[in-house]
């Protein structure tokens, strides 16, 4: 059945900012959808609030709106663009919920917009827990015994009926948000309360606990002729109880019998038909009892999901692309398989290799968070590996996580019987470190029966891990490493580093092991992902390594450039770096063969048809060097780009160069120069530029001496960090003592000598009340091109990745911008930059300070590119390949005159706001971790507000980042520190003028009273200074108060917005309870005066209700006209 001819234009809704449970996989699926629609001659209208996405590039759609995914905004875009259809199944839960809201508001009917990909009824049946249960029953399948609740009273009645443990699953949420396993009434009330709150329909499913069962997933697709294919079965190594996003998963399934698999297939096909998904795909999760084989259907997603991206990359079967074609009316047998070019999409993929996905976590960013893995997803990223067997695949995946000690290690003494007993107790609870603890227990002598009893991980997987340990012990104890034994180690997934450690050679022994391996002629070969287990030839070069006999690499003629990706998403290194890598691939592909190396299944860069060759491999020195050596034999290689993928590839630069690999762009020596305190200090001295006073310290005594010389407050951090890891603002000696004690405790015991750290702490003067600025620029050795000057909304002290910022800057003078331009030129010249550089500055009392410089792509490059209409990363890639800025001006990649540092009258304003994952991270007793922002980055994603002025743009950024955006009336609670009290009267008067009622603690209320401003007094909550914020609180009843504290008022829904600026770190726990309650209630809250002042401007803009809705194509045209007029 050919495609429908009545659909001429389609609106695609993206997934918005990167959050836990909904990450880069939806940029991948949305990008595929846009490409397919445009290939089919359909006009594409795209809406997404995330600027760090390839799908929001202007060439991906005819009209691209970087706007909040909110019903009023979506209606304005629909009214303007009049699409024939809406495709919501490729933007995750956000897009699905937005489509449902548009349907319920009557917008789709009003503008005659048809929903394609899945009907409202199908979405409802798949997402509504009660309706889905009926579908499962009608399919002849079984659900866990369950009931629906909309209140805690209903929850209690269900608990009486079923008993404990119970699983709580909210309707219409993603990543298991608000879900959990309750073992008693207290846990049930906490989890179910959160679930009802986070469900848009205030609905939770309470079901019998099935912890310990085996968990499986099926990815299915169905067309309008009722053809159904199972794209990929996936098995979770962790049993039911751990969210699939937090579990190690594998394909194909290893522990299902053929009969069980056929039964899952039959149930899955019946369910996709019963739900009514007839032009797209879905994901269905199952539980199988390990002893009886009883099958229970857990849930389904009637859309492209996180697992869809994994299944696509695992098999080479492009689910999002095919789902889009099905939504247009094609049938599976009419769609060609891109990889084979000779089989239709109705042929189910077959794989002859093993795929393993390992999650990456960020608990270190959230002190106090409960590290237990449950049904609510907590991982921030994932890595995938392909190999010839499970052991090799697991080893590759674990080292792909790019986290210290994430691979198995056998360092130190063999665990004692006492330690084994402790480890067996520890692995009862699933955590990030469970598999490392499990391996140590096995090394120490734990039996398979003991490990199975503790974890309920299927014995087949445990046997494989036992075999890895057995091989490791053979390597450790052998007299010599024979070719046979070394190959056995490689087949068991052991890296050269791991083998070196087993042989007692340490990290430095990696080169020795590699040289020995090469002497033996033992090198990996590269196999092709072909969707058909080699039954047909593959037309697309998509490779993975394994230790087999024959390589499938083919010779090439053009010179090649290898681009190293950023690996798994993490806080501090996310989708922004994949964006820059993809731009480099797109641009350099015009003149070179582009070779992409990455291990993240969520990203656009790992799409099989994005680059000329794709290697799905770990980003380690060993793996990258092997790829370079293999590619050299296939054709000429110009060099490797390490500047675009963040810290991961950057950290490999020096070693790759030393091994003879040409590094394109800024040299490793120049990268080190910018990160070396003394050398960079010389660059600044020569340029006559200021830096905050600083010192270094290896001990507490040295740290105190430096802090006293510099003067408190100081910013303390370890050497060489990404995302502000370990940074803290320290206000006194007592706090400094704690920081150094913690640093000593975290360092390896054998590296601490006489209370001295192995590497120095960096101590800087903290610039209080300074204006912080980010500058992104290009440099070719002679000419500088400013990509963007971004002014932070918060004062210095909040990590640049968490701070809101505006482009163009809103308060900087022409003279200040001139000084920033001159400073950036001097630094780029002094550091010998060839490509991108990011410099962070601060203005304090109009004195310019340089905070740091990074000679690489920064996380603000996509934002600056979208705000200025210039593809900075594409130009950077060409400069790294040897071209000049003048060349880029001539070829149209850069503006013919001027640059992104110029401000034009009438120019649109862009505001970037960060999105934080605090609601995901709770303490063991169920409270959210503290949200206070500081120098350590904690955000997972970002949004962009785009409008004619700062207030409107900031208002949009808040609407995009937080459900409902900013309130326009209601009650505001204010509690500020002593320093901020002098600014309080003006803020209070403005709030009154805007129609808000004020609530305050006694101290703040008394200040307001002196200025004739009345407020409602609430009781103060205080905790003992420097104690655990979980500690019991003392309630102080204030004279004239309403008899309640602010937490009680928040819980009663009587507070609409909060301003709570804390004092120094020691007393910051005072506001913890307030901030935790506000997070639980989804209230907008501000912890700095400057951001609250910005919010007041935005609230006034919201009240006018006159947002300007403009596509980025229209914006670029307007910007071009302004520049042409000016120059």
Swiss-Prot record:
Keywords: Amino-acid biosynthesis, Arginine biosynthesis, ATP-binding, Ligase, Magnesium, Manganese, Metal-binding, Nucleotide-binding, Pyrimidine biosynthesis, Repeat. PANTHER family: CARBAMOYL-PHOSPHATE SYNTHASE [AMMONIA], MITOCHONDRIAL (PTHR11405:SF53), CARBAMOYLTRANSFERASE FAMILY MEMBER (PTHR11405). PROSITE patterns: ATP_GRASP (PS50975), CPSASE_1 (PS00866), CPSASE_2 (PS00867), MGS (PS51855). GO terms for cellular component: cytoplasm. Binds 4 Mg(2+) or Mn(2+) ions per subunit. Composed of two chains; the small (or glutamine) chain promotes the hydrolysis of glutamine to ammonia, which is used by the large (or ammonia) chain to synthesize carbamoyl phosphate. Tetramer of heterodimers (alpha,beta)4. Large subunit of the glutamine-dependent carbamoyl phosphate synthetase (CPSase). CPSase catalyzes the formation of carbamoyl phosphate from the ammonia moiety of glutamine, carbonate, and phosphate donated by ATP, constituting the first step of 2 biosynthetic pathways, one leading to arginine and/or urea and the other to pyrimidine nucleotides. Mn(2+) 4 binds at residues 852, 854. One of its GO terms (biological process) is 'de novo' UMP biosynthetic process. Residues 552-962 are annotated as: Carbamoyl phosphate synthetic domain. Residues 963-1127 are annotated as: Allosteric domain. Belongs to the CarB family. It comes from Bifidobacterium longum (strain NCC 2705). Pathway: Amino-acid biosynthesis; L-arginine biosynthesis; carbamoyl phosphate from bicarbonate: step 1/1; Pyrimidine metabolism; UMP biosynthesis via de novo pathway; (S)-dihydroorotate from bicarbonate: step 1/3. This is Carbamoyl phosphate synthase large chain.
């Amino acid at each position: 059945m050919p495609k429908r001819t009545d659909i001429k234009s389609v609106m695609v809704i993206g997934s918005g900012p990167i959050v836990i449970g909904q990450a880069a996989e939806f940029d991948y699926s949305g990008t595929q959808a846009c490409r397919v629609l445009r290939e089919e001659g359909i006009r594409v209208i795209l809406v997404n609030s995330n600027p760090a996405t390839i799908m929001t590039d202007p060439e991906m759609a005819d009209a691209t709106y970087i706007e909040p995914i909110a019903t009023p905004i979506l209606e304005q875009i629909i009214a303007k663009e009049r699409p024939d259809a809406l495709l919501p199944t490729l933007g995750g839960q956000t897009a699905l919920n937005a489509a449902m809201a548009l349907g319920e508001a009557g917008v789709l009917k009003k503008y005659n917009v048809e929903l394609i990909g899945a009907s409202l009824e199908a979405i409802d049946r798949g997402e509504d827990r009660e309706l889905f249960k009926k579908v499962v029953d009608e399919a002849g399948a079984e659900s866990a015994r369950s009931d629906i609740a909309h209140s805690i009273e209903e929850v209690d009645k269900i608990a009486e009926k079923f008993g404990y443990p119970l699983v709580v699953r909210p309707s219409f949420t993603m990543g298991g948000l608000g879900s959990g396993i309750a073992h008693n009434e207290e846990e049930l009330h906490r989890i179910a309360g959160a679930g009802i709150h986070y469900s848009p329909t205030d609905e939770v499913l309470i079901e019998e606990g099935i912890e310990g069962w085996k968990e499986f997933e099926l990815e299915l697709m169905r067309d309008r002729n009722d053809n159904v294919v199972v794209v990929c079965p996936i098995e979770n190594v962790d049993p039911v109880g751990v969210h699939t996003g937090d579990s190690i998963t594998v394909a194909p399934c290893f522990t299902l019998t053929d009969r069980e698999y056929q039964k899952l297939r039959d149930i899955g096909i019946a369910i996709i038909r019963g739900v009514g998904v007839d032009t797209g795909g879905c994901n269905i999760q199952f539980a199988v009892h390990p002893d009886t084989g009883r099958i229970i259907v857990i849930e389904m997603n009637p859309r492209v999901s996180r697992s869809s991206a994994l299944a696509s990359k695992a098999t080479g079967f492009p689910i999002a692309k095919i789902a889009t074609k099905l939504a247009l009316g094609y049938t599976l047998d009419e769609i060609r398989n891109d990889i084979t070019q000779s089989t239709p999409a109705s042929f189910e993929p077959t794989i002859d290799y093993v795929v393993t996905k390992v999650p990456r976590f960020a608990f270190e960013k959230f002190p106090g968070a409960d590290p237990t893995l449950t049904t609510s997803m907590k991982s921030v990223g994932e890595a995938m590996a392909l190999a010839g067997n499970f052991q090799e695949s697991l080893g590759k995946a674990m080292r792909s996580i790019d986290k210290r000690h994430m691979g198995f290690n056998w360092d130190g003494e063999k665990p004692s019987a006492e330690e084994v007993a402790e480890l067996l107790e520890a692995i009862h609870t699933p955590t990030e470190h469970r598999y490392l603890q499990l391996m140590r227990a096995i090394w120490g002598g734990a039996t398979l029966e003991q490990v199975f009893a503790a974890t309920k991980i299927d014995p087949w997987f445990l046997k494989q891990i036992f075999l890895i340990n057995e091989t490791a012990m053979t390597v450790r104890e052998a007299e010599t490493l024979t070719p046979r034994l070394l190959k056995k180690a490689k087949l068991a997934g052991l890296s050269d580093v791991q083998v070196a450690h087993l042989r007692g050679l340490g990290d430095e022994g990696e080169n020795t092991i590699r040289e020995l391996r090469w002497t033996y002629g033992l090198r990996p070969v590269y196999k092709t992902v072909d969707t058909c287990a080699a039954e047909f030839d593959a037309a697309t070069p998509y490779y993975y390594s394994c230790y087999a006999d024959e390589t499938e690499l083919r010779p090439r003629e053009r010179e090649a450039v290898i681009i190293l990706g950023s690996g798994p998403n993490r806080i501090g290194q996310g989708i922004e770096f994949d964006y820059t890598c993809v731009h480099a691939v797109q641009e350099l592909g015009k003149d070179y063969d582009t070779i992409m190396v990455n291990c993240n299944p969520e990203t656009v860069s790992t799409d099989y048809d994005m680059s000329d060759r794709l290697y799905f491999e770990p980003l380690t020195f060993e793996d990258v060097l092997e790829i370079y050596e293999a590619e050299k034999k296939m054709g000429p290689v110009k060099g490797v780009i390490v500047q675009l993928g963040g810290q991961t590839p950057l950290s490999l630069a020096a070693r790759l160069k030393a091994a003879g690999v040409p590094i394109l762009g800024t040299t490793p020596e120049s990268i080190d120069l910018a990160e070396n305190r003394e050398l960079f200090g010389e660059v600044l001295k020569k340029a006559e530029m200021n830096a905050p006073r600083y010192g270094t310290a290896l001990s507490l005594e040295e740290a105190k001496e430096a802090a006293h010389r510099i003067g408190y407050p100081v910013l303390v951090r370890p050497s060489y960090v990404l995302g502000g890891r370990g940074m803290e603002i320290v206000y006194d000696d007592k706090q400094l003592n704690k920081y150094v004690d913690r640093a000593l405790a975290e360092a390896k015991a054998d590296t601490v000598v006489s209370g001295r750290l192995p590497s120095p702490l960096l101590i800087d003067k903290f610039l209080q009340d300074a204006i912080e600025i980010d500058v992104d620029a290009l440099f070719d050795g002679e000419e500088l091109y400013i990509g963007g000057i971004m002014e932070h909304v918060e004062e210095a002290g909040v990590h640049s990745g968490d701070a809101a910022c505006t482009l163009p800057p809103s308060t900087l003078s022409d003279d200040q911008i001139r000084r920033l331009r001159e400073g950036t030129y001097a630094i780029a010249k002094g550091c010998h930059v060839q490509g991108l550089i990011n410099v962070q500055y601060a203005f304090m009392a109009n004195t310019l300070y340089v905070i740091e410089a990074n000679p690489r792509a920064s996380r603000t490059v996509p934002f600056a590119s979208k705000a200025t209409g210039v593809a900075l990363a594409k130009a950077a890639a060409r400069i790294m390949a040897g071209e000049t800025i003048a060349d880029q001006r001539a070829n149209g990649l850069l503006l013919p005159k001027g640059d992104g540092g110029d401000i034009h009258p009438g120019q649109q304003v862009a505001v970037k706001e960060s999105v934080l994952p605090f609601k995901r991270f709770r303490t063991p007793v169920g409270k959210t971790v503290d949200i206070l922002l500081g120098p350590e980055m904690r955000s997972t994603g970002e949004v962009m507000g785009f409008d004619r002025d700062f207030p409107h743009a900031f208002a949009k950024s808040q609407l995009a980042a937080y459900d409902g955006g900013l309130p326009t009336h209601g009650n505001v609670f204010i509690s500020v520190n002593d320093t901020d009290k002098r600014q309080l009267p003006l803020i209070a008067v403005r709030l009154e003028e805007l129609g808000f009622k004020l609530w305050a603690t006694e101290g703040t209320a008394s200040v307001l009273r002196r200025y004739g401003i009345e407020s409602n007094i609430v009781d103060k909550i205080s905790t003992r200074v420097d104690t655990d914020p979980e500690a019991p609180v003392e309630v102080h009843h204030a004279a004239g108060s309403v008899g309640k504290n602010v937490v009680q008022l928040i819980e009663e829904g009587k507070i609409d917005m909060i301003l709570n600026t804390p004092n120094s770190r020691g007393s910051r726990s005072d506001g913890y309870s307030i901030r935790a309650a506000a997070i639980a209630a989804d209230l907008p809250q501000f912890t700095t005066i400057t951001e609250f002042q910005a919010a007041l401007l935005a609230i006034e803009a919201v009240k006018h209700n006159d947002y300007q809705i403009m596509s980025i194509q229209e914006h670029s045209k307007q910007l071009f006209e302004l520049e042409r007029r000016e120059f």
